[in-house]
């Protein structure tokens, strides 16, 4: 899953700033918007498995990050988009529905990727404790509902290969609209499981044009 995220970062046009929001039971901005792709890659590679999932908080954190970016010289705030990858099961923080409603109110579509299978399992290890088998089934309905509520698009991926293809499809569609000036603003958020078939630790990307 890390490799798929890194591939996605590489696909985004260099002039577009990317940021990273990491979330498990809470959400936090790991990398502020930057065109430094190596900084993003290094941050993704350092991700470690955590407990719980707060998808709603990740969306709220992403929306706040978008709101903190100043408008251009003409005072225009370009449109934004969110792409979220996870298993859809929120265990901590504010409900997904509240986050989706806030995104809809702000006019920011949230596309979602369901990553995993209905019978997914992982082995979770805490230092000094015996490994535990953890059930992490995918809840596609929650992720589909987020996309539907915000005019986003819903995707599914049951393997690392399928996930990479989804990111390829999304990344290849991110670019510039040429008019009198560059006006496209992409906020790309992806909640991606650190290990395949788990959503214990997730991340989100956000971006905007310089």
What residue spans do the PLM features occupy?
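Solvent-exposed coil/turn segments that connect beta secondary-structure elements
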Residues: 14, 23-26, 36, 45-49, ...
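Juxtamembrane amphipathic/hinge helix adjacent to a transmembrane helix
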Residues: 152-181
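Non-transmembrane functional regions of envelope-associated proteins
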Residues: 20-21, 28-48, 60, 67, ...
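…and closely analogous acidic/polar surface helices at protein-protein or active-site interfaces
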Residues: 1-18, 32-37
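C-terminal signal-anchor/stop-transfer transmembrane helix together with its immediate cytosolic
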Residues: 172-210
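VWA/integrin I-like adhesion module and closely mimicked acidic/polar interface patches used
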Residues: 47-49, 53, 57-60, 72-81, ...
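Generic structural signal for helix capping and beta-alpha/helix-loop junctions
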Residues: 28-30, 120, 164
């Amino acid at each position: 899953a890390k490799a798929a995220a890194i591939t996605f970062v590489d696909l985004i046009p260099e002039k577009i700033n990317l940021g990273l929001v990491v979330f498990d039971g809470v959400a936090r901005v790991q990398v502020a918007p930057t065109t430094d792709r190596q900084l993003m890659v290094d941050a993704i590679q350092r991700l470690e498995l955590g407990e719980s999932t707060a998808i709603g908080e990740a969306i709220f954190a992403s929306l706040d990050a978008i709101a903190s970016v100043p408008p251009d010289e003409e005072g225009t705030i370009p449109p934004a988009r969110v792409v979220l990858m996870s298993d859809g099961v929120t265990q901590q923080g504010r409900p997904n529905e509240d986050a989706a409603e806030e995104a809809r109110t702000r006019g920011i579509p949230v596309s979602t990727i369901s990553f995993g299978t209905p019978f997914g399992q992982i082995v979770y290890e805490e230092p000094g404790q015996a490994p535990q088998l953890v059930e992490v089934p995918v809840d596609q309905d929650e992720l589909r509902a987020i996309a539907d509520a915000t005019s986003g698009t819903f995707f599914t991926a049951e393997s690392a290969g399928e996930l990479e293809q989804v990111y390829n499809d999304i990344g290849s569609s991110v670019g510039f609209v040429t008019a009198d000036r560059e006006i496209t603003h992409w906020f790309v958020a992806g909640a991606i499981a650190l290990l395949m078939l788990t959503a214990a630790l997730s991340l989100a990307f956000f971006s905007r044009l310089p």
